[in-house]
């Protein structure tokens, strides 16, 4: 089995959107349009298994201090290979290289992120611009049932 992590190009967006569609439809991941993904393509890391896109995530920078793991997804048939863990670890490494101080995650998978060293925080600690830029677009807003977690770099 050949596993490859790489930075995508805009040509990968269609396949990435196909992969995340089910999670977007059920409200576990926020919809990102093709243009939004193209605009932030440098923030994504993709993993391929035997030449097929198996998962991806993005490290979105909110400020000189705070970044966020976004849109973490691994295809069901590739789960159990620790690809999600490796994608988040890639975000952590990138955050350190960029000199950031903290990585935020809004998640339904508390145990997964705790195992990677993230700590739960109260949602009122999330910067207001994050709420108005992203959360307001969520189908669950304003009754967010995600767990806010941070990793100190």
List PLM regions with ranges:
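A conserved beta-strand-loop-helix scaffold within acyl/acetyltransferase catalytic domains
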Residues: 31-50, 55-66, 70-73
């Amino acid at each position: 089995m050949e596993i490859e992590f790489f930075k995508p190009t805009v040509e990968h967006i269609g396949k990435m959107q196909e992969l995340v569609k089910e999670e977007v439809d059920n409200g576990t991941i926020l919809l990102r349009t093709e243009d939004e993904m193209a605009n932030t393509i440098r923030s994504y890391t993709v993993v391929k298994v035997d030449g097929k896109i198996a998962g991806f995530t993005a490290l979105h920078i909110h400020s000189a201090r705070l970044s966020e793991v976004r849109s973490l997804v691994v295809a069901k048939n590739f789960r159990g290979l620790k690809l999600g863990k490796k994608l988040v670890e890639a975000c952590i490494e990138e955050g350190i290289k960029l000199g950031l101080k903290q990585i935020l995650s809004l998640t339904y998978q508390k145990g997964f992120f705790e195992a990677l060293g993230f700590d739960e925080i109260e949602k009122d600690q999330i910067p207001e611009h994050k709420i108005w830029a992203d959360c307001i677009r969520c189908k669950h807003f304003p009754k967010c049932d995600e767990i806010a977690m941070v990793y100190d770099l």
